[in-house]
Amino acid sequence: MKRVFSIKGIPVIAAVALLMLTACGIDAPVDDPDNQEPDDKEEVRTGIQSFTNPADGRVITPSGETITCVVFTDAAYAAELVIHSGESDWAKLNKGATGEKGRNNIRIVFEENETEEERKAELMLEVDGYERTSLAVFTQNPSGKTAAMEQNMHLNGYMHDILLEDYLWADEYAKLEVDLTIDYTRFLDTYLMSMGDVNIEDGGLYRANSANPGQRFIYSNIQELTGTKAIETGGLGFGPIFASQITESGLMGLSIAYVHQGSPAYAAGMKRGDTIFKVDGVTLTSSNYQSYMTQLYYSPSGTYTFDFVRDADLETAYTAEVTAGSYIYNPVLYSAVLTEGAHKIGYLVLENFDLNCQEFITDIVDQLASNAITDLILDLRFNPGGAVAQSRYLTSAIAGTAHLDDTFVKVTFRDGKTQDWKFRGGPNDQDGLGIAPDLGLDRLYVIGSYGTASASELVINSLKGIDFPVYIYGGRTEGKNVGMTTTQTSYKGRTYLFSPITFRVANAKGFGDYPDGFPADVVVNNQNDSYADDKDNLFPYSFGDWGSMGFNVALRYAYEDIIGVSHSNAPATRSASFEPIPFGHTGLKQPQQGRFGNIIYLPASQR
């Protein structure tokens, strides 16, 4: 990352939109002819160092799509797309038909398949001085009603059967007349939303400060699993981004909510609050910024050059080149300790509760314990939930060994059966994660928002159930007091995960009535449709990094309460910031569960 030029006298205006960035990259074998001894396998020498195909392991969608492959070669090359079936122009090379030595993008456009026949095309490539080789075979499914109907009937039928048995409102659902042939991606919204207020706890209404105020949404969902190792993810490494107009002349910026540790963007030096105003040399304006947001969201691979400003300092701009790729997912977005007098304040920002990443959580809890923290600020503003077991593990470290035999959560299923989880572990005092070290705390400071839900809210409610003081800063939490079991089904080699709402949760006192969320004790953003009455109208987002209390207003208020000074509504002038603590994680075990933004319980077969 380097500084490139200055922008002077530019006022900052409000945030207006957000979008998740995801992408994936797949490593390919390296074939280095310079390091191979001559043998009988000379024919495998291709001159291709690596090849990344974002469509590897799946079929091309019948509606058509555009993919960008990345190839590294030892010399110039020529590529050809060979059509094996279907009309001659249904798949075309849009970019990269020829290229020089090194890295090149090969873009392929697949048209919609309006026939009832499967189509195949093969990407061939010949590097100068090497033999012609096949890089990939692409298969596109037919769009005929029969194939689509079979898939919909399988997946909808699978969901329908489970909803009839285990859905928390199964009796009311059973009264519906459902069409199993509709698009399976619309099945849940179509029928579960039609139930009205009966199942309002399965979702709710978007809040006034959202993009869809007052509209209904549901939690129950089905999603296709795209890989076998959920711990390994791909892309640029950005979390959500929000768009803001940064000049009166219409210059737009895409501000990053956070950057995953160990990701390509993290390695390139980018961080939370960086505001991108150019992508590959193109200035973002009100007429093109949305297309770039979409491009970054859907691009599974590729290299981007970003020009951006940092910490709302519009006098200096930076540039970074980021190449999408695979990396180990880490739900710990930031961890730090700040010593202030007699206080050693731990600050932990956690994106979700993911059993695949338990070793990260174990490691950071161990480090907080070894640092002998006296106070903890747990930032859950972007944490939509996840595994009950991991939420239990972290909360037990906060509550301490004195509460190991107290109830963490009571789970009640549709049939009336209940299970009682202790802070020690559960059900039956055993969830496989063990007992966390006692952090020696007597209270907890939580930063929450409308993005704090499910297993994150279990932390708050379970501690309230044992009269352990919890103070919330930021905004009202989501209010998801129901959870789901997860099951899988396969269809023609593709795996789908279904997560319907199947149980309610309550704490040791029997309290679970928080469908409107937990209110903040110190409100930073009241989440209404006006920015004028907010102490921080960007919250939960920011133009600064996690540890900068000048931008992280909720963090500053919690810090001020801990050290016993009054709050200031003016921007902080304090120069000290939280500094990250070293991360000591060295290894990972085989993944156990997927990563999901809900309260996730064991499937029925594992209970």
Predicted segments with their positions:
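A short beta-strand micro-motif common to beta-rich folds, especially ectodomain repeats
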Residues: I106, E116-G129
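Surface-exposed binding patches on compact interaction domains or structured appendages
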Residues: G47, D74-R107
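PDZ/PDZ-like domain segments forming the peptide/carboxylate-binding groove
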Residues: I231-K278, V282-T285, D354-F360
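C-terminal, low-ordered peptide segments at domain boundaries
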Residues: F277-I373
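C-terminal "post-core" interaction segments
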Residues: H343, Y347-L348, Q358-D363, Q367-D375, ...
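Solvent-exposed, low-complexity, repeat-rich "mucin-like" stalks and linkers
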Residues: E42-I83
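Extended, small/polar residue-biased N-terminal targeting/export presequences
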Residues: E150-G253, S301-T303, V309-Y334, F596-Y601
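Bacterial Sec-dependent N-terminal signal peptides
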Residues: K2-V4, I13-N53, G129-M153
